[in-house]
Design a protein with these regions (language model features):
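Active-site-proximal inter-transmembrane loops
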Residues: 139-144, 213-237, 243-244
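Metallocofactor- and cofactor-centric catalytic cores in central/energy metabolism, strongly enriched
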Residues: 209
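Non-catalytic, topology-defining segments of multipass membrane proteins
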Residues: 1-203, 247-303
């Protein structure tokens, strides 16, 4: 792995203060304590918002791998912004740029060139990438509601924090047996959950280009990883994805766990999404042809 310094702009702690505040907020567990209620809400919001990032920001806004209505498109975008990873236009624009230049010097987060730390979180903190690459997402910019959401992306996370505080206060007053409070739900339900969500997502930019095994030749360093697929609801089948980014499913085979795919299939049963794109037959044929041939069994020598 190259250790060559990255030629990007420096960090700006003030402009990224929310990112650091969320991480520091996790220290609040020492003061607010823990309860099964808080842990349950933490994990539930992790899964729900991870789907919003993987199933909406990534598979829909970045790659248009399925279709939906304008209303549900906005709801997906709104849910995605609660993950505190900025708006759908910003997210999709930088991801599309990544696919155009994957693991080259033009890529914004190639771990093999600029290092694992930069690929994981450094680029997110760089002042160079604060604004979206609007020229790459003209299809999204034509929706004024998405532009507004992108501009005011900080509002949904704040509303989520407020809702958690209100819920914690209510449960503390009316269900004391749950042993929770406003502060506890803010710390666990937002700060801890969001921090886990950050680094689960970031692992795809960093570790999914370093660990695992490739099935396809893609011209980059993308890998498939079962562990990363579990913690990101299916994004760990990254080599599959880089071979055919237009596919809604990233686990190409039934044994490749892809929870975001299962959720989208479920939503399609209710008509909320449709035209979910599958990998074509030629992709599966390519995978078969790349399998290492099995050596024929050796016949034992006669005594």
């Amino acid at each position: 792995m190259s250790t060559r310094g990255q030629p990007f702009h420096p960090f700006n702690i003030v402009k990224q203060s929310a990112f650091w505040a969320i991480h520091l907020g996790c220290l609040g567990v020492y003061w607010v304590g823990c309860s099964w209620t808080a842990i349950t809400i933490c994990l539930a919001l992790y899964v729900i918002r991870m789907f919003a990032v993987t199933g909406a920001y990534h598979r829909y806004f970045s790659h248009r791998s399925y279709q939906t209505s304008r209303v549900f498109q906005f709801l997906l975008a709104l849910l995605g912004t609660t993950a505190a990873q900025k708006g759908p236009i910003w997210w999709a624009s930088h991801h599309r740029h990544h696919h155009k230049h994957s693991d080259t010097e033009e890529d914004i987060h190639p771990p093999g060139i600029y290092g694992l730390w930069w690929a994981h979180v450094g680029w997110v903190l760089s002042t160079q990438f604060i604004e979206p690459r609007s020229e790459l997402v003209k299809d999204l910019c034509r929706f004024p509601e998405l532009r507004v959401l992108d501009k005011h992306h900080i509002v949904p996370p704040l509303l989520l924090m407020g809702a958690l505080a209100a819920l914690g206060s209510y449960l503390g007053a009316h269900a004391p047996e749950l042993h929770t409070s406003a502060g506890q739900l803010i710390v666990w339900g937002f700060c801890v959950s969001t921090t886990l969500l950050y680094h689960g997502t970031f692992c795809i930019n960093s570790l999914a280009h370093v660990i695992g095994r490739p099935r396809f030749k893609t011209g980059d360093d993308s890998k498939n990883s079962f562990i990363l697929a579990l913690i990101t609801l299916g994004e760990g089948w990254h080599n599959n994805h880089h071979r055919y980014p237009g596919s809604e499913r990233q686990g190409f085979y039934w044994w490749e766990v892809d929870i975001s795919h299962y959720i989208l299939r479920g939503l399609s049963l209710f008509g909320l999404v449709w035209d979910l794109r599958e990998p074509p037959a030629r992709i599966y044929q390519e995978a078969l042809e790349r399998q290492e041939p099995q050596e024929p069994p050796q016949m034992p020598l006669a005594a």
